[in-house]
Regions:
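Membrane-interfacial alpha-helical segments at the cytosolic side of multi-pass membrane proteins
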Residues: 5-11, 63-73, 127-135
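Transmembrane helix interruption/hinge and helix-loop junction motifs
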Residues: 11-18, 75-79, 143, 186-193
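Alpha-helical transmembrane segments of integral membrane proteins
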Residues: 1, 18-21, 53, 57, ...
Length: 195
């Protein structure tokens, strides 16, 4: 949550590399909350439910609202852009609400770890949008920021799509973190100034 708040400052300063780095940090920190929660074996039912709810609220801000704020700071302020922001954020809200209901039911039936997600997880935005930005900068795509806006629309729809997405294990999470680091390095090498 703090990373998203700090990143919002960078977005409004038009420092998109640091804003997207903060988005990646949101994903990095989010990848460990489940590990920490599962290490607490003596949690009460209330604590488990609180954890699910607070995690989703933070995810909504960090991965549902914050990427739209970055796009808004890029100058997308027209009515059609507003519609895309609404679709993206509503997709994230619906996805998180659905996840909470399904996760609560799943935890009542089993203690096994979740193996897949229904719909694209909102946390995936922490790599998707930095990747879009990185590719458009590296390939010198004209009007690269429009690609980011289209990405918002597509990802917002995928949040609520009836698809199964495999949940990465610990090695998979480390691989995704490594991928995020590579994205950041590429941006630095291409000469995008961080500050």
């Amino acid at each position: 949550l703090i990373s998203a708040i700090v990143g919002t400052h960078f977005a409004f300063e038009h420092n998109y590399v640091l804003a997207l780095f903060c988005l990646m940090l949101c994903g990095f920190f989010d990848s460990f909350d489940g590990i920490v929660a599962r290490s607490k074996k003596d949690r009460t039912e209330e604590e488990k439910k609180f954890g699910i709810q607070i995690d989703s609220l933070v995810d909504l801000i960090s991965f549902g609202v914050y990427p739209a704020i970055i796009a808004y700071s890029m100058g997308f302020k027209s009515f059609p852009c507003l519609i895309i922001f609404i679709i993206y954020i509503l997709g994230a809200v619906i996805r998180l609400g659905y996840f909470n209901v399904m996760e609560d039911m799943r935890q009542q039936q089993t203690t096994e770890k979740r193996k897949y997600y229904q719909g694209l997880p909102v946390t995936s935005s922490c790599l998707i949008f930095p990747m879009i930005y990185c590719l458009t900068v590296c390939l010198s795509v004209p009007q690269a920021q429009f690609v980011y806006l289209i990405g918002l629309l597509v990802v917002g729809i995928l949040f609520v799509a009836n698809i199964k997405v495999i949940k990465p294990d610990f090695k998979g999470v480390l691989g995704l973190i490594g991928f995020g680091i590579i994205l950041l390095i590429i941006l630095i090498i291409k000469g995008v100034v961080l500050i």
